[in-house]
Amino acid sequence: MLTRVALHGGVGGPTTFRAGRGLVGYTIERVVRVSATSARLTFRHDGGDVHVEVPCGPRPLVPLDTLDQEHVSLTPRVKSLLTTMLQLHSLGRDICMVPATLDAEMRSQASSSKSTCIHLFAALLGYPVETIWLWKDVSGTELLMRRATTPSGATIWEPAPLTLSALRGSLVHLAGVHVLGPTLESLSRLTQDREMELWDGTRLTTDADVPLSNELVDGHVCRMAPNVRIIATAPQIGDWLSEGVANMFATLAAPPMTADEERAVVRQQSGVSETALDPVWAFVHKYRTQASDANVGLHKARRFGTRQLIRIARRLARWPDDDVYRLLFRNQLCDFLPRTVRDIVHQMLLDVGIAPHGSEGAFQYKPPLRLSAPVVEAGTLAFFDESGKPVLRVPRYDWRSKDPEGASLIPNAHGSFFHNTQQTGLMHSIVQDLETLDEHLLLMGAQGTGKNKIMDQVLELLDRPREYIQMNRDLSLIHI
């Protein structure tokens, strides 16, 4: 039935996204500021251009023809999504972006560019973006207000980031709304009527006959910024997308990248050569195909998204001789998978010609990297292999000019760290990700394997201050 009415690929179908068009065949052509809080959108169409005046933010508008310079790839699919978002915005609707599920051609684990489109949308309309990451136990009250303590020890209510954004006219990105379940419907008054009921009779509404202000007045009716917009995102569709939620938001199904688009984006963002990426692409295609089969067991393993591909590609662009097997095995957290699933991933890597260094065979043998102890010299941290050949050199952190107060936070092992090849190899990998690629790290391992010791040694060698926070199960996000 869907095929007969051309809806088997979702609203507009895949042809619309490949052509870069929005709803009903329109394409965004130009965005021009009209006043401090409004802009004029020009949509191009074969039947004639359409001009619409819409709310906008206070920041300078980024011209449409310069969006490619914002470190993103403005592909036809992204431009189609962006045009559709602007059309829904011109109708005064908040948006809920979910991955498309109807198009069998594009079933994959590739990115659907939801976050990228949100930031492009904000750049075009001059909105500051307030991203609010949601978690399962948050209540409707916590979304709007939270408890705080004054210097005298008294507890008071204060506005949550969502309320402050509504007060100041920001673009709110509610990330992961699927975890809220029925709690999401507690925001219906905000999305549909632009009203919020707060503490002690304090109300926020766009109809208030008072001047706009960045501060709330307790017990009074305050004016909400008329240009506030909310965009919710979720990685999957489920029971949370009820009839009530569908009335709150205009739902936009974002299709994932095709294989050709994803490959072009990864190459553009990383600069990696085509030949270096070929075996990785072969593995990714095989992994995603197997992960869609619940009988294999990979459906519970870590998905292989586009962001992970870009991270791996950046490493290969910088160090082409890196151990690809180790990178992929570590990226998918295979050490924490069941033995049978781990063996499946291992066999898939071998099937596409990716083997760990030291096991390729007599004619393709690549010895594993064995490092000597790292050396600090001339303001840099240097790693050498056992033959004395330099492998990596990075500048140490200049805390004297960047963070003078952090000198006391630099770890000092007082010479109690003893070098061995395995730990030095791990430190080498940490320095690559932390200093050269500017990545955040998650170091996982059983208790007593030296995680803290290794990180302290890395930071001591880099001369970087460390802020240590001991986590426990009773620690809430607000406390952090």
Kindly give the residue locations of the regions a language model identified.
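Conserved AAA+ ATPase "SRH/arginine-finger" region at the nucleotide-binding site
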Residues: 132-135, 250-261, 469-473
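Structural recognition of the conserved hydrophobic beta-strand(s) that form the central parallel beta-sheet
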Residues: 173-175, 199, 228-235
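A short helix-turn-beta junction within AAA+ P-loop NTPase domains corresponding to the substrate/partner-engaging
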Residues: 127, 239-260, 464
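Walker A/P-loop
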Residues: 94-134, 440-472
